Amino acid sequence: MCVFSSIICSTILSTSARESSEFLDNITNMQIAITSTSLLIIIIISYTLAQRKCTSTTLQDFSIWKYISAITLVGVVSYSIMNGVRAKVGNTPPGIAASGIDRTLWGTYVSVQAKAQLGDRIERLLSPKHLEGTTIKATFADPVDIVVILGETARADFLSAYGFKHSTTPVLDSLIAEGDAFCFNDARCAANSTIESSKRIFTLWNDRPGLEWCDFPNLMSCFSRAGYRTIWYTNQETEGPFSVERMFGKTVDLLRTPYGKSGGVVTRVGFDEEILPVIGKFNDSLQIRQPEKKSGQLSIIHLMGSHYQYSLRYPSKFNHFKKEDVIRKNGSTANAKVAEYMNSILYTDYVLGAIYALYRERPALIVYLSDHGESLYDSPDQPDLCGHGGRPTLEQADIPFVVMLTPSFRKSYPALSKRIYDSRFRPISTAWLTNTLTLTAGIRTRYSDDRYDFFGEKFNPPTQRTTQGEGGKALYPPVKIKRVK
């Protein structure tokens, strides 16, 4: 049972054409049958009442549509009260109790207010005051590429690079064997939803109490101050309250998508490989158009990754895994979805390899991480959950974090390359990424902290890693086993 709240309402208001299409594709025959049957029963009862001869003049004036409206309203209110009472006496968890009419109105109001406030937060994010006192002591003697690949909904334990029994990351496994890449053994996402996670990934906020994400320097503006070209490539929508690109798009020199002016909002978002020619085109043209920026280039690449609906994330030739290949059995339908998820990981691996190939002949430091993980019918508290959000779970918090260093980067900066490689068994949080990358490049703001620099020699975080979710933060113990090479 869904609880109507400001979160649900915000989702409805910000839903794009792509998401609407995927929602309709996911409606089951059983759901259609239940809805149709309920409507039919209401119509039959209303028609019967409308045909009856009543002594009451008021009831005689009732049309069938008035009966339908009245019965529906009574049903909704009664069901809401019933579930509220059941939740209060402990027969059902409060989280699945139906909401009242007051929450419907309040949730709508809150979501509309939140949408209006987003513009204000974006303006605050762009304030030049955030960078006051910033010092630059360049680490790199020559221009380099710093690349952050933001994946979607990938969990670490489904990658063969992290020990998964099936070969879901053959390209990455090969890069690791060749010495071009390595994985961090224990990385936690800062939040279990894309927007909340991105607020922490791309700023120096680090959940400082009493302040908001938009009151701190962001990764892109920091690198721009240091003389880097900045560009954001995306295979996701560029508009809407739930769009990362809407939040951070103004912080970069260029925002590019395969979908032109539509930005993927009205057109259907395709496979992640469609972004590859866009990356190649603008990587070369930026060097010509902005020759004054000598430090190099910061590129953010936002993939669709394993975003639900999984089967829409990869071409048919990547339909490799079947439900019989699923290790943890959960029934035919669930196993089929998990197999589709495995295929989406396999396809993302292919895309990562193709992106690396675009930068391989240049000095580049490339980081791939996921915004959050995914529950796949394996959450102890919610065994039927396939998705993310709400209360955090370990499956949603445990994400892959991969570093790829090109041969020319390793040759030019051997000590730094070794230091980054040696840090792969540190327990890290994606909330510390902006702090780490800026300090690595020699960019120091008044909010920088060497203790949170997980590539650095002084790494010693004074706070524990947490994953933000609905209702608060969750804390999970470090990974105790060695999962990566």
Model-derived regions, located:
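Transmembrane and membrane-interface helices of multi-pass
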Residues: M1-A97
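Active-site rim elements
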Residues: N206-G210, G263-T267, A334-I345, D349, ...
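Active-site-flanking alpha-helical
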Residues: L159, Y356, D378
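Flexible internal linker/loop segments at domain or repeat junctions
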Residues: K317-N335, S408-S417
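A long, amphipathic alpha-helix that forms part
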Residues: G133, P277-Q287, E324-Y368, R424, ...
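Membrane-interface soluble catalytic domains
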Residues: T48-Q51, V74, Y79-I81, S221, ...
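Histidine-centered active-site microenvironments of extracellular/periplasmic hydrolases
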Residues: G163-S167, A364, L369-P414, D450
